[in-house]
From Swiss-Prot:
Oligomeric and partner information: Homotrimer.
Known catalytic reactions: a (3R)-hydroxyacyl-[ACP] + UDP-N-acetyl-alpha-D-glucosamine = a UDP-3-O-[(3R)-3-hydroxyacyl]-N-acetyl-alpha-D-glucosamine + holo-[ACP]
Domain of life: Bacteria
Organism: Ralstonia nicotianae (strain ATCC BAA-1114 / GMI1000)
PROSITE patterns listed in its UniProt record: HEXAPEP_TRANSFERASES
TM regions (residue ranges): none
Name of the protein in question: Acyl-[acyl-carrier-protein]--UDP-N-acetylglucosamine O-acyltransferase
Taxon lineage: Bacteria, Pseudomonadati, Pseudomonadota, Betaproteobacteria, Burkholderiales
This protein's UniProt keywords: Acyltransferase, Cytoplasm, Lipid A biosynthesis, Lipid biosynthesis, Lipid metabolism, Repeat, Transferase
UniProt GO molecular function: acyl-[acyl-carrier-protein]-UDP-N-acetylglucosamine O-acyltransferase activity
Length: 271
C-alpha cells in the first residue's frame, strides 16, 4: 500500500505538517501546520490534530477525537504551547486533549502505552505517565499529574493540580479534589461522589508482579497514614522510619515512593 492510499483524499493536511511515510489518516480529518506524527500512527476519520502537537510511533487515534486544541484557560493568549504524546497510545473516539499554557511549563505530556477510552478529557498542562487507563468519560482538569499504571474509572472527575500516584486507582463516578498516594484505591463513599481512600490496590499490584512482602509493607504504611491516631506529620515520620528499617530493596523502594509522594503534597491527600 502506498502513502497516497493511506491518506484519505478528503483529509485536509497542512503542507507544513510532518507525517512519517506510513502514517494513516482517515476521511475528513484535519491536521494543522505545526503537527509532527511519527511512524506507524493511525488516525481515524473526522479527527482534528492541531496546535504544536507531536505524536510518537504506533499511536491509534479514534474517530472524532480532538488532539492538540487550544487550552480552556481564559489566560491563554495564543502562546505556542505544546502537546507531546509518546508511543503506542490508544486514544478513542471523541476524546479531547489540549496543549499547555504559559503559566505552567507550556506542555501537556502523555507517555507511552496508555489506554484512553471514549469521551475522555485531558486538560492543559496535564502530565500523564505510562501504562495508564482512562475509562470512558473520565475528565481531568488542568495541571493534573497521573503516575504510571494508574487507572481512572468511568465518569470520574479530577480537580486541577491534583496528583494521582503510580499504581493508584480512582473509582468510577468519583470526584477527586486531593492527591491519591501511589498504590492506593480512592472511590466515592456512600451518599455522595467525593472520593475517599479504600485501601491498597492489592489486586493491581499482584497483577504487576509485586511481591507479598512489598504489598505487606505498603499495607502497613497505609495503616499508619489512614488507620492510626497519628497526625499527618507523625504518620510521615513513622513511615520514614519504616523505610529506613526495611531490608528488602524492592519493598524499601516502594515504601520510599509512597513516602516521597505524600511529603510533596500541596493540596493534601485524599481523606
Amino acid at each position: 500500500m502506498t502513502q497516497v492510499q493511506k491518506i484519505h483524499p478528503t483529509a485536509v493536511i497542512d503542507p507544513q505538517a510532518e507525517l512519517a511515510p506510513d502514517v494513516e489518516v482517515g476521511a475528513f480529518t484535519v491536521i494543522g501546520p505545526n503537527v509532527r506524527i511519527d511512524s506507524g500512527t493511525r488516525i481515524g476519520h473526522h479527527t482534528v490534530v492541531e496546535g504544536y502537537t507531536t505524536l510518537g510511533r504506533d499511536n491509534q487515534i479514534g474517530h472524532f477525537a480532538s488532539v492538540g486544541g487550544r487550552p480552556q484557560d481564559m489566560k491563554y493568549r495564543d502562546e505556542p504551547t505544546r502537546l507531546i504524546v509518546g508511543d503506542r497510545n490508544t486514544i478513542r473516539e471523541f476524546t479531547t486533549i489540549h496543549t499547555g499554557t504559559a503559566q505552567d511549563v507550556g506542555i501537556t505530556s502523555i507517555g507511552d502505552d496508555n489506554w484512553i477510552m471514549a469521551y475522555v478529557h485531558i486538560a492543559h498542562d496535564c502530565r500523564i505517565g505510562n501504562h495508564t487507563v482512562f475509562s470512558s468519560n473520565a475528565q481531568i482538569a488542568g495541571h493534573v499529574e497521573v503516575g504510571d499504571w494508574a487507572i481512572l474509572g468511568g465518569m470520574s472527575g479530577v480537580h486541577q493540580f491534583v496528583r494521582i500516584g503510580a499504581h493508584a486507582m480512582l473509582g468510577g463516578a468519583s470526584a477527586l479534589v486531593q492527591d491519591v498516594p501511589p498504590f492506593v484505591i480512592a472511590a466515592s463513599d456512600k451518599g455522595g461522589n467525593k472520593a475517599a481512600p479504600h485501601g491498597v490496590n492489592v489486586v493491581g499490584l499482584q497483577r504487576r508482579g509485586f511481591s507479598a512482602e512489598q504489598i505487606a509493607g505498603l499495607r502497613q504504611a497505609y495503616k499508619l497514614l489512614y488507620k492510626s491516631d497519628l497526625s499527618f506529620d507523625q504518620a510521615q515520620a513513622e513511615i520514614a522510619a519504616q523505610v529506613a528499617q526495611t531490608e528488602d530493596a524492592p519493598s524499601r523502594e516502594a515504601l520510599r515512593t509512597f513516602a516521597d509522594f505524600i511529603a510533596a503534597t500541596k493540596r493534601g491527600i485524599v481523606r
